[in-house]
Amino acid sequence: MLEVVEKLMLQYAYETGLSSNLKPKRYLWTDAFAVCNFLELWRKTSNATYLELAIKLIDQVHYVLGRHREDDVRRGWISGLSDEDGFKHPTIGGLRIGKSLPERRPDEPYDELEWERDGQ
């Protein structure tokens, strides 16, 4: 069973851009579980690769989800911090979930389908 989990998690790392040159695909909740899985794999196998993947995933989540989306007119860290300070404190302004659609702007009306469409 452990080998199956290892294979799945290494595939996840590759397909989401964690261990490959693919564009990173980050989604907060899935990535949180992935960090737990990598840490447990490291604990079970003593293979430092899994610890490194967990740390790299945390860093990538902070960098991608702590910043505004690429299609947003705003740039940089959600917190508004400079790049240097944002790297030091990546979660100070919170993290995006990483859903495929942009966040609803404050002036946009509530859409009942928002929850179903984005799995929130």
Q: Where is each model-derived feature located?
A:
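Glycan-recognition and catalytic cores of secretory/periplasmic carbohydrate-active enzymes
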Residues: 1-120
